[in-house]
Amino acid sequence: MDKKRTTSSFRAMSTERKLESIFLFVTGRCNAKCAMCFYAQEMDKKQPDLTFDEIKKISETAGQFNRLWISGGEPTLREDLPEILELFYKNNHIKDVNIPTNGLKPDRIVEWVKRFRQNCPDCNINVSLSLDGFGTTHDTQRGVPGNFYKALETLRKIQENFGDDGKVLKNIATVITKYNIDQIEDFMTWVYGRFRTSTHTIEAARGMTRDDGVKILTESTLRKIQDDISPIYSAYADRMVADTTGLRKPITRFFYLGLIRTLYNVLSLIHI
């Protein structure tokens, strides 16, 4: 990560121009060895992360914006992540924050979400948990034995602690590779039936991956997957608008399905 370039880019921002979102790369460290990681070569260089003071300068110059997207590496390895989130809540009045995680630290995640809900009560927090398939499929893809059950433990503990909290959202994120391509539909169906997740996003492996040969997908294959999982996303849409009434119900459902299709096209098909 080029710290000087990142910092200078934010210094150049005009605080008079309101941003919608900021993507913040908080660490290059990771406790997994994902086969499809497109940042592996950069992580191997072990470049230093942005310091808290550097991130503070970003917050102080960004002005108000709505959504903070945390990125890495594995964000839960950043010890001061709670302070970083609270910084942007106080200075920038964020309304939503998204945190991706491999779920290897379930207790830390739950502890941090509790702290965030207490100190940032008006902000939604979305925990985006990586799950790529059943059991050993997930562990093989992530390069960590037992990762699957750790991730499930994380998801279960989030449900137990925040099940009725509408400001704590749970999203499952799956990356399509040669390891899981034959179980995407079954896996998504299983996740939908077992957990009260907000949604389940999928994307194809992209970039210079750690392991050669994980990106075996063609446009026709991705189109077929899109068609196969369409009923699952319809079920997610129905779940989302279950308590919605009037004209808002079909409109919300329509835009949700359109957004999901657009995300799939951008995150997967554009990389073929």
Residue ranges and their predicted role:
Residues 119-269:
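Radical SAM enzyme [4Fe-4S]-AdoMet core and its adjacent flexible, acidic
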Residues 2-125, 161, 220-228, 232:
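Conserved alpha-helical substructure of the radical SAM core
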